[in-house]
């Protein structure tokens, strides 16, 4: 799977995976919306519903092209959870410092 950087990477039937924080979704590319060329149409791989996604949203760094790769998705989720753990550790440190300063 590679980051979607250019709309030209999309070919009919190709897989596109959305990954953001702890959310992910897998789509199959269909075509440009017939009435609005600022939207692209996809089939949701799990529900089989047609989904329309705005072009600029596709290029924001949260979409990847290629066959669905469970290992890749799980590594991205691990990165997210590591960031969350660091954030919570920093909050704990800040709270402890404030408590020390009060005493």
Predicted feature residues:
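Mixed-charge, Lys/Arg-rich low-complexity intrinsically disordered regions
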Residues: 1-10
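Short beta-strand-centered aromatic/proline hotspots
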Residues: 24-35
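SH3/SH3-like beta-barrel fold
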Residues: 40-44
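Intrinsically disordered, low-complexity, charged/polar segments
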Residues: 46-95
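Short acidic DE-rich linear segments
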Residues: 94-103
């Amino acid at each position: 799977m590679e980051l979607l950087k250019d709309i030209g990477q999309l070919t009919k039937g190709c897989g596109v995976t959305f990954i953001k924080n702890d959310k992910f979704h897998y789509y199959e590319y269909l075509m440009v919306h017939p009435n609005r060329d600022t939207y692209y149409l996809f089939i949701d791989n799990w529900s089989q519903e047609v989904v329309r996604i705005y072009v600029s949203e596709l290029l924001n760094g949260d979409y990847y092209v290629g066959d669905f790769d469970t290992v890749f998705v799980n590594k991205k989720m691990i990165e997210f959870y590591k960031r969350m753990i660091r954030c919570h550790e920093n909050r704990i440190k800040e709270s402890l410092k404030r408590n020390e300063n009060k005493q």
